[in-house]
Amino acid sequence: MALQDQPAYIIKMRAKPGLGDKLFELVRAGMTKSGASERFIIAREDGDPDILWNVEVFKSDQAKVNYENSPLADELSDEIINLLAEPPMRIPVHPYAALPINVS
Protein backbone atom coordinates (compact mmCIF):
# COMPACT_ATOMS: atom_id res chain seq x y z
CA MET A 1 0.00 0.00 0.00
CA ALA A 2 1.36 3.41 -0.95
CA LEU A 3 1.89 5.91 1.85
CA GLN A 4 -0.56 8.31 0.19
CA ASP A 5 -3.29 5.66 0.55
CA GLN A 6 -2.88 5.41 4.33
CA PRO A 7 -5.16 7.53 6.52
CA ALA A 8 -3.52 9.66 9.18
CA TYR A 9 -4.25 12.25 11.84
CA ILE A 10 -2.42 15.31 13.05
CA ILE A 11 -3.56 15.87 16.63
CA LYS A 12 -2.83 18.65 19.10
CA MET A 13 -3.66 18.12 22.76
CA ARG A 14 -3.09 20.44 25.71
CA ALA A 15 -2.83 18.68 29.07
CA LYS A 16 -4.03 20.29 32.26
CA PRO A 17 -1.10 22.07 33.93
CA GLY A 18 1.48 19.58 35.16
CA LEU A 19 -0.14 16.55 33.48
CA GLY A 20 1.92 16.63 30.27
CA ASP A 21 4.13 13.68 31.27
CA LYS A 22 1.10 11.54 32.08
CA LEU A 23 -0.59 12.47 28.77
CA PHE A 24 2.54 11.66 26.76
CA GLU A 25 2.95 8.28 28.43
CA LEU A 26 -0.71 7.36 27.96
CA VAL A 27 -0.68 8.31 24.26
CA ARG A 28 2.62 6.48 23.62
CA ALA A 29 1.45 3.34 25.40
CA GLY A 30 -1.89 3.38 23.61
CA MET A 31 -0.38 3.75 20.16
CA THR A 32 2.08 0.94 20.81
CA LYS A 33 -0.66 -1.29 22.22
CA SER A 34 -3.21 -0.76 19.43
CA GLY A 35 -1.06 -2.02 16.56
CA ALA A 36 -3.20 0.03 14.15
CA SER A 37 -0.49 2.54 13.26
CA GLU A 38 2.39 1.89 10.94
CA ARG A 39 4.29 4.94 12.17
CA PHE A 40 3.77 7.81 14.52
CA ILE A 41 5.53 10.84 15.91
CA ILE A 42 4.74 12.30 19.31
CA ALA A 43 6.28 15.72 19.90
CA ARG A 44 6.28 18.16 22.79
CA GLU A 45 6.26 21.91 22.24
CA ASP A 46 9.48 23.54 23.38
CA GLY A 47 7.64 26.47 24.95
CA ASP A 48 4.90 24.49 26.68
CA PRO A 49 5.59 20.97 28.00
CA ASP A 50 1.87 20.32 28.43
CA ILE A 51 1.20 20.49 24.65
CA LEU A 52 1.43 17.26 22.67
CA TRP A 53 1.49 17.02 18.89
CA ASN A 54 0.88 13.61 17.37
CA VAL A 55 1.16 12.49 13.75
CA GLU A 56 -0.29 9.01 13.42
CA VAL A 57 -0.28 7.04 10.16
CA PHE A 58 -2.58 4.03 10.15
CA LYS A 59 -1.73 0.80 8.32
CA SER A 60 -4.95 1.00 6.29
CA ASP A 61 -8.46 2.42 6.27
CA GLN A 62 -9.66 -0.81 7.86
CA ALA A 63 -7.02 -0.69 10.62
CA LYS A 64 -8.14 2.88 11.42
CA VAL A 65 -11.82 1.87 11.53
CA ASN A 66 -11.07 -1.22 13.63
CA TYR A 67 -9.08 0.83 16.15
CA GLU A 68 -11.63 3.65 16.35
CA ASN A 69 -14.36 1.10 17.14
CA SER A 70 -12.32 -0.90 19.64
CA PRO A 71 -12.68 -1.08 23.43
CA LEU A 72 -9.08 0.15 23.70
CA ALA A 73 -9.94 3.37 21.81
CA ASP A 74 -12.91 3.98 24.13
CA GLU A 75 -10.79 3.36 27.21
CA LEU A 76 -7.94 5.60 26.04
CA SER A 77 -10.31 8.33 24.91
CA ASP A 78 -11.91 8.55 28.35
CA GLU A 79 -8.51 8.60 30.10
CA ILE A 80 -7.06 11.17 27.71
CA ILE A 81 -10.08 13.49 27.87
CA ASN A 82 -9.75 13.57 31.66
CA LEU A 83 -6.17 14.87 31.31
CA LEU A 84 -6.95 17.65 28.82
CA ALA A 85 -7.37 21.35 29.53
CA GLU A 86 -9.33 21.87 26.29
CA PRO A 87 -10.80 19.76 23.48
CA PRO A 88 -8.16 18.24 21.20
CA MET A 89 -7.64 19.44 17.63
CA ARG A 90 -7.69 16.51 15.20
CA ILE A 91 -7.10 16.93 11.47
CA PRO A 92 -7.54 13.95 9.13
CA VAL A 93 -4.81 13.83 6.47
CA HIS A 94 -3.09 11.49 4.05
CA PRO A 95 0.73 11.60 4.04
CA TYR A 96 2.46 12.78 0.91
CA ALA A 97 5.94 11.58 1.78
CA ALA A 98 7.92 10.15 4.69
CA LEU A 99 11.46 9.78 3.51
CA PRO A 100 14.85 9.98 5.17
CA ILE A 101 16.76 13.13 4.33
CA ASN A 102 20.13 12.41 2.76
CA VAL A 103 22.53 14.79 4.43
CA SER A 104 25.92 14.87 2.74
Predicted regions and their residues:
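Non-catalytic surface loops within mature trypsin-like serine protease
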Residues: 15-17, 59-60, 94-97
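Short aromatic/hydrophobic contact patches that present stacked aromatics
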Residues: 10-12, 55
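Short, surface-exposed ligand-recognition loops at beta-strand->loop->(often short) alpha-helix junctions
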Residues: 12-23
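Glycine-rich beta-strand-turn "strand-cap" elements at beta-sheet edges
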Residues: 1-8, 39-52, 77-104
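Short, low-complexity N-terminal intrinsically disordered segments enriched in polar/charged residues
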Residues: 2-3, 21-25
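Short phosphate-engaging motifs
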Residues: 19, 50, 63
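An amphipathic, aromatic/His-enriched active-site/gating alpha helix that lines ligand/cofactor pockets
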Residues: 29-39, 57-92
